[in-house]
Amino acid sequence: MQVLPPSSTGGPSRLFIMRPVATTLLMVAILLAGIIGYQALPVSALPEVDYPTIQVVTLYPGASPDVMTSAVTAPLERQFGQMSGLKQMSSQSSGGASVITLQFQLTLPLDVAEQEVQAAINAATNLLPSDLPNPPVYSKVNPADPPIMTLAVTSTAMPMTQVEDMVETRVAQKISQISGVGLVTLSGGQRPAVRVKLNAQAIAALGLTSETVRTAITGANVNSAKGSLDGPSRAVTLSANDQMQSAEEYRQLIIAYQNGAPIRLGDVATVEQGAENSWLGAWANKEQAIVMNVQRQPGANIISTADSIRQMLPQLTESLPKSVKVTVLSDRTTNIRASVDDTQFELMMAIALVVMIIYLFLRNIPATIIPGVAVPLSLIGTFAVMVFLDFSINNLTLMALTIATGFVVDDAIVVIENISRYIEKGEKPLAAALKGAGEIGFTIISLTFSLIAVLIPLLFMGDIVGRLFREFAITLAVAILISAVVSLTLTPMMCARMLSQESLRKQNRFSRASEKMFERIIAAYGQGLAKVLNHPWLTLSVALSTLLLSVLLWVFIPKGFFPVQDNGIIQGTLQAPQSSSFANMAQRQRQVADVILQDPAVQSLTSFVGVDGTNPSLNSARLQINLKPLDERDDRVQKVIARLQTAVDKVPGVDLFLQPTQDLTIDTQVSRTQYQFTLQATSLDALSTWVPQLMEKLQQLPQLSDVSSDWQDKGLVAYVNVDRDSASRLGISMADVDNALYNAFGQRLISTIYTQANQYRVVLEHNTENTPGLAALDTIRLTSSDGGVVPLSSIAKIEQRFAPLSINHLDQFPVTTISFNVPDNYSLGDAVQAIMDTEKTLNLPVDITTQFQGSTLAFQSALGSTVWLIVAAVVAMYIVLGILYESFIHPITILSTLPTAGVGALLALLIAGSELDVIAIIGIILLIGIVKKNAIMMIDFALAAEREQGMSPRDAIYQACLLRFRPILMTTLAALLGALPLMLSTGVGAELRRPLGIGMVGGLIVSQVLTLFTTPVIYLLFDRLALWTKSRFARHEEEA
């Protein structure tokens, strides 16, 4: 067994000890680079790990979900399905709207995905309906990603149509141009239009049809090229009064003549300025408004984007009339900044606690100043590297630096403690620094690279979780590496200049009392260690028991994915009976809004009713509830949600589903609850059979709550069953029937009014105020081949049926999504297992496939790779330690400390009521790196004592344990206090930080107590094993 010998001449530290000016200037350069880097780093909630996502929206007013699916969604899906790099394609086809969400592989640049989407849309153009009002529009945005900012525009003096027109032309377009903005949506549906409401009885009495009126309007309002005249000396451009701009002009339009008398549009219709879609509405609190939601592009920095919007807003609002009020209702960056500020405060607190524990142990101001300089220098220097790596200041990188506080101080402590030992023995400070730094240099290198080795597996984690923690791992590794450099350069140089026998021996009353206390603790530890060494097998059984206990705890501890954060914003979905109309839904929504706004934690509320890119049907409404800042309300978001749901339960005929918005968004669709599970089949019939059965089972599970499905197949349909023979005999085609129905009930966009600033539509429909419901179909008239007027009822029968309100696809096949939450007394792991067990009992046919989606799918993936991740971390550390020690045995001795860390972390999580989520798992992996430091410091000195002083293994490890007890205790407490602010955090984003702190504090406490006794015992056992192995080999060689 060979060990690399430590240098007695200062090793790599010698040059820096002997050149203090150069060392000081080098450290100043690192400090300045870090400060400049800190100022240049962007701020965000989490690392940018979004999947490249593009949403394609196609609007076809009046089309049923079935028509939207077959005529619009399917042709587009076929083209999109051929794109390379596509990870998942989901679509939702509802009345008048098709929304397709395309999620690409993480490695595909968003700009490349955009080019492929545009090419696919172009290829599908010829397959789409010819009367589609507008071509498909794509946006580089994830629809499930909550808006970064929500603004409400209201006015007490102007109609909403004029307000929306101004907002669209003067505000929304400018905000859309800001870098990082992916989509600006205006909810409220008050876009100006000229609405033509036909009087069915009037046109029937005159022998006219709606098609006659439509043809007259489209022919009277045109905007096309007319050419120019080019004479010998002058050129003249041709123009004409071919455009009609106002409702009054349309009223005067002559649509036909009877007996030589003109029939004007105003004679048979009500023509008025109105909204393009009367089945859309938005409210801010209790006031009707135009709600502007700003969503970012995937990968864009949310803070800089929001800052740019706020800088532009005053300029934009100045262009609006004074009666128009623009209010910022929600800004996600407010909570993000608060969370980052809290994490920065916890970082400073960790530094202060670490410096305090150093002084408590060293009891010497100069000796305390040295690590007090090394710690912030290592952390600040990390910022410079983060800039070059395109990182950001976010919760995870700041958590990495907070944890690094306990790590980076370890190196400085080890160096100072070793140099101080030689100074106290009477050596000169310079000689002691050279000798102490040279002796400890190999230990520092071992500690550093073995700790970085633990982080290596995090860099190779796949999918979005790996991307998420890459910044965390690299930031921590860089801080540790800079710390090692500082500890081998600045720290010994400062020790040589600042420490002396007089300063170290200078004691006050506190120093003397604490020194006596430490001496008593070391003496007690020595007595206990001697007893333990005399009973090695009992100690070994304790070590094996911790290994078994850690495995049992791992199996039984509740498991989750990502902590649920309180960001102060709640997303809500309001569900009413499937036959609800727009007016009915708007009334129910206002009732619910009144209840919600009475809650003391609610600051504001926006709501939307109607069908658009995020809301699939008229019987549902979207809500965004903005809570007061955390310090202004008594309860956190989960309690507020429970209270709101209880209050809304008293409103009859509606179901409310609420979930808090999260910084990490993996889903690609707006969901009712936090977690999703999908059923996919080859036909809608198969889904209609099995979805109700599965829903019934899942709603009975105690592990699930708020179980709901987007399967809605009880929408009322008036099925027009045309007698094709009769229609053909009269010369009426099915196209004529469809056109007549579309003209009457589809809010048909029949013409466009062009202005210098915008384009507006002419909307055709029947006035159904006097003939509500199915009776309106009796007023439909068609033109026969001989010019006569034929009632629809003479060639068709009307049947009332049920049909889906929306048709959803996943990768081109019908799918339904089951959403659910997890009750407080269960974990996501419990819920996932319960769903899988239930699925098995149903014996689903082979043509139905099930899959978890979004964060639930990511949880499954992360859970499956967690064990391998920890194994990889242990293997990586073993390889590094084996190379450093040139031994197969000593790395095993060092790694034997790991089960104690696992037991402590898991027990702490159980006691605190926290789940084992990905944050806690990262803490356990870091514990692997921290805990083994104790063993490294013991074994390094034991091997040196055996080699240089000829001690027996037992005496060597005994002396090493006593000699290194103080620095071991100091470094462990430093790491513990570095994690303590995270464990005790209560501010914004505390849910994210607390599991890491809990796991690390618990693991450090238990491992500190156990490893001080188990490590020396295992060292001796492996030493005996090595001797026995050598003797066996020697005997075999002699016999040979």
From Swiss-Prot:
Membrane topology term reads: Multi-pass membrane protein
Q: Per the record's keyword annotation, is Secreted included, yes or no?
A: no
Q: The organism sits in which domain of life?
A: Bacteria
Sorted UniProt keywords: Cell inner membrane, Cell membrane, Membrane, Transmembrane, Transmembrane helix, Transport
Cell compartment(s), UniProt:
Cell inner membrane
What does the function comment of this entry state? Answer: The MdtABC tripartite complex confers resistance against novobiocin and deoxycholate.
Q: Which HAMAP family match?
A: MdtB
Protein name, UniProt field: Multidrug resistance protein MdtB
What is the organism field in this record?
Escherichia coli O127:H6 (strain E2348/69 / EPEC)
Q: What is the lineage of its organism?
A: Bacteria, Pseudomonadati, Pseudomonadota, Gammaproteobacteria, Enterobacterales
